[in-house]
Amino acid sequence: MKAYKLILMFFALMLVNVVSAQKNTNGNVVAKSRDISDNLDLQAVASIFGDSKDLEDFEKKLNDPSMQISNLDLNQDGYVDYLRVLEVAEGDARVIVIQAVLGQDQFQDVATIELERQRATASSSSPNVNIQIVGNPYIYGPNYIYEPYYYRTPVFFDFFWMPTYRPYY
C-alpha cells in the first residue's frame, strides 16, 4: 500500500512539473517609466536611417557609441543593449525591425520602419516611398508613429526593389 502511494505521489509530482514546464515563457519587456523612450529617439533613428548607405551601415550607426543614438538598457544589466536590424519583405512593402538583444536567443522588438513603394504615376516619373517609424507600444506607448520626410530619397531605398536584392539578416 505504501509503495502504491509513493508511486502515485511520484506521478503526481511529475505531472505538476510537466504542466509548469509547458507554460509560455515568452514575454515582453515593459517600460518601468515613461522616460525609457528618451533612450532611443525615433527621430534620430529616422535621420541615421536616411543617411545610411545600406542596412548593415544603419545597424553599425545605431550601435556606434560615438554617435550616442541608443541608450537602451531593457534587461537592466548596466550596459547599453545591442540593437540588431532585420528585414522582412513582401511585394512592394518592406519592414525593418529594430530589436534589442537582451541575452542569448532573447530579443525585444523596439521599433519597426515600414516602407511601402507607390508605383510611378503620370504626374511623377519615379516611384514614391512612404515611410513610417513605429515604436513598440510596450516601450513608447500606443500609437507612437513618426513619419520622416527626406528632401532627397536616400540612395539605398532604390536597392530594396531591385530584382537582384537580397534581404538583410
Label the predicted regions:
Residues 1-25:
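Bacterial Sec-dependent N-terminal signal peptides
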Residues 23-44:
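Short N-terminal segments immediately surrounding and downstream of signal-peptide cleavage
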Residues 38-63:
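Start-of-domain marker
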Residues 63-71, 85-87:
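Glycine-rich, compositionally biased intrinsically disordered regions
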Residues 70-82:
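Acidic, glycine-anchored loop motifs typical of Ca2+
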Residues 82-84, 94, 99:
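Post-signal peptide N-terminal segment of secreted/secretory-pathway proteins
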Residues 92-95, 141:
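Extracytoplasmic/secreted cell-surface and envelope-processing proteins
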Residues 99-169:
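Low-complexity segments
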